[in-house]
């Protein structure tokens, strides 16, 4: 069973290249964080990716356990990098850079290399965050169709199952498939990027053909990774389930999730009661 997602919370979009952000031209006056992405096997960086010697380097390491069907007996990690001025748009990374500089044995060295470790971050999501910091959007871009007066995702369409292509990721920490934009939203919450939260919510509303199981696992992820006073993403899922209730009430996954319980389903009960009250008020006003 599938449900469509609804377009919500408009936000201004900035122009971006659809290519990888590591190809961006950066003024030499900006301090540089290496823009290589590679498997973490040593402290070295490929020669072609080495920055100018007079610029300092920052690197961000993420890690996750390699799947068992892969032929690697060790934990896989990836090295990301970015320019300091760009990274510090995020209050989280600005504070992390300050701490890293303070802890560096030679903070004034022009050739220093400072690492920021994010062991709990999914590499695919951090890639979206960095791309947004450089480009104001992340792939696929949200494009405004002036003819139809609607927003669209660039170069996307339904797959063989009718679901928007590349709408989901497998989240290794939870062991479930979730909507990528939900993970980006939660990461933006963590890193203090309010415009990115609005962008991720809008892009999530442009997907279609999403499985009920994916919506429910994404909703649980949203509840687990946002504060209790968060009013956008959580409300989006509650409204979606209520709007598509005829589909969800036939879903075996919905039954299993409700039996597990959690704050999501109490909020859903309250939202459903409010919805019924609104319908009753609207009906009485027409009488």
Spell out what each predicted region is.
Residues 55-58, 73, 124, 170, ...:
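Residue-level detector of functional hotspots within protein domains
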Residues 1-160, 262, 266-287:
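BTB/POZ (also called T1 in voltage-gated K+ channels) oligomerization domain detector
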Residues 161-169:
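Repeat-mediated protein-protein interaction surfaces in helical alpha-solenoids
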Residues 118, 169-173:
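Intrinsically disordered, low-complexity acidic/Ser/Thr-rich segments used as protein-protein interaction/activation
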Residues 129, 148, 172-183, 191-287:
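Alpha-helical protein-protein interaction/assembly modules
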